[in-house]
Amino acid sequence: MKRQYILAGVTTLFASLFISCSQEDVTDESFPQPAKEIVFDFEISRTRTITEGKKTFFSDGDQVGIFGLKRGTEEVLHDNLDYHYLASSKTWTAESSITFPIDGSDLNFYAYYPYVAGIRGVNFEFAVAQDQSEEDGYSRSDFLSAKNETSQVDDESITLSFVHQFARVEAEITVPQGEVIKSVDICAKKTAVIDLAKQSVTVKPDEAAEYITMQPAGERFRAVIPAQDTGKGKLFRITVESGATYWYKTVENIALPENEITVFSIDCTNPSF
């Protein structure tokens, strides 16, 4: 009986040690939940062009920059990540995926188009192309921005609805018979000061206006510029193939509002022109 008692005691001791060690191992080893990758749904508001039945679409190779800030703070967790569009698969891909923090914190998202490498933080300057006569110069000047400050960690996707933040100017031009328009330029400031968190876009006040070459689009010429009030004087410069130059002058300041199209009708055959 004594021998049996000792064996039972030893067996019990080893069993206790095994259970104790197993429990300690489980307690010490941590298994963090993986960070949840974020899926974005991008769309563009029709606000500016709805009256003409037009709509802006993202096209193959377009790039947007995205920032992720911890909600309630100014801490930037994702800084100007590059997302680009693949038309063949109708998908957006990124240089590195955006995830919610492991601690479950919510994020505010801010985005802009077109993407500019080297930007850090949600406050920066953006300048339109001085030559917008070709599609690339025009489209890469059309600044858009978006925000989402209501997303939750368990959302299946995050919607970012982009809005046109610049003014669009169009000019319908009539030149004397026999003349052919070579180029049309508008005198305006090129640079805007951006605050994505506030969705604020303002023209750089101390910048001098320059002539920006407009893009021919059907019977009109067009350009996108930061919203601004034009100064008095020579607003448009029209150059024709014969070498002659026509000027369209204003006698008062003209407002060019953001997210709107302002159309000018210019008749170069008018004797007073």
Annotate each PLM feature.
Residues 2-8, 18-273:
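Sec-type signal peptide cleavage vicinity
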